[in-house]
Amino acid sequence: MRPLKQATPTYSSRTADKFVVRLPEGMREQIAEVARSHHRSMNSEIIARLEQSLLQEGALQDNLGVRLDSPELSLHERELLQRFRQLTHRQQNALVALIAHDAELAQA
């Protein structure tokens, strides 16, 4: 006799974790405007921005020890890393956001 298949839990808005956030005055409208420009819901916009922020923090923490002379890096990776490190923090964030946005478009 075969064992019964167990249902794989599926993600839905009903089963998702919920968290109430108090936004400063005017921020809700700003988020709505940006979400419209990216053709996504406010929830999706907020999630995308939180994910990007968490990824950036994780990447920075994980890659603090990456050296330009590391044998793990290709020539192109060394050049990109060197140029990236020369950018201001604001420019780095903008570049990462641009790359993330392009990746989202490619997946759509």
Swiss-Prot record:
Q: Name one GO molecular function term.
A: DNA-binding transcription repressor activity
**Do you know which InterPro entries this protein is assigned to?**
Arc_DNA-bd_dom (IPR005569), Arc_rbn_hlx_hlx (IPR013321), Ribbon_hlx_hlx (IPR010985)
Q: Does the keyword Transcription regulation apply?
A: yes
- What did gene disruption experiments reveal? Deletion strain produces no detectable surface pili. Also abolishes mucoidy and algD transcription.
GO cellular component labels: protein-DNA complex
Does Cytoplasm show up as a keyword for this record?
no
Keywords, sorted A to Z: Activator, DNA-binding, Repressor, Transcription, Transcription regulation
Q: Which GO terms describe its biological process?
A: bacterial-type flagellum assembly; negative regulation of bacterial-type flagellum-dependent cell motility; negative regulation of DNA-templated transcription; negative regulation of single-species biofilm formation on inanimate substrate; positive regulation of cell motility; positive regulation of single-species biofilm formation on inanimate substrate; regulation of polysaccharide biosynthetic process; type IV pilus-dependent motility
Domains: entry comment: The C-terminal is essential for tetramerization as well as efficient AmrZ-mediated activation and repression of its targets.
Query: What name does the UniProt record give this protein?
Result: Transcription factor AmrZ
Please give the organism: Pseudomonas aeruginosa (strain ATCC 15692 / DSM 22644 / CIP 104116 / JCM 14847 / LMG 12228 / 1C / PRS 101 / PAO1)
Classification from the root reads: Bacteria, Pseudomonadati, Pseudomonadota, Gammaproteobacteria, Pseudomonadales
Question: What gene name is listed for this protein?
Answer: amrZ
